[in-house]
Amino acid sequence: KQEWFKNTLFVITADHTSISSNVKYQNALLKYSIPIILYDPQLPIPKLLNTPMQQIDIMPSVLDLIGYNKKFYSLGNSFLQSNINKTVVQYADGIYQIANDSIVLQYNGEKILGAYSYKTDTAMVTNFAERVEPDNFLLKKLQAYIQLHHYGMVNNKMICND
């Protein structure tokens, strides 16, 4: 081992996934699943987190792990924060998608196209979009993500103001 090894936090992940032969990963949500491994040789026994996490959560997680306590801008959240409602957001083919630990909503910017209990309905065939209220927490969170992202990009404001 090199001297620097003990002072290094290793981040191992994929930038995308390929088509899986496992049917579990062939639905509109789980087809985006990739491994994210944060390895610190000085931390105790590793643990597996079975919670929604996405690539934009890597930076806040790394900053949390190294004890960074200054302001920073991120649409992601540290996986160390257990007090937040963790979600993942994707956009593909004109459809926004947000999921928490059990539900996924699909939204075209105007209306909900799909709502599925992906943990129990892994093929995502039972769509209950018509029963989702307009003030649904996940929908509001998705709309906030979209608004924050678009505002930040248009106004070049994806920074933390002091």
Predicted features and spans:
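Solvent-exposed soluble domains appended to multi-pass membrane proteins
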Residues: K1-D162
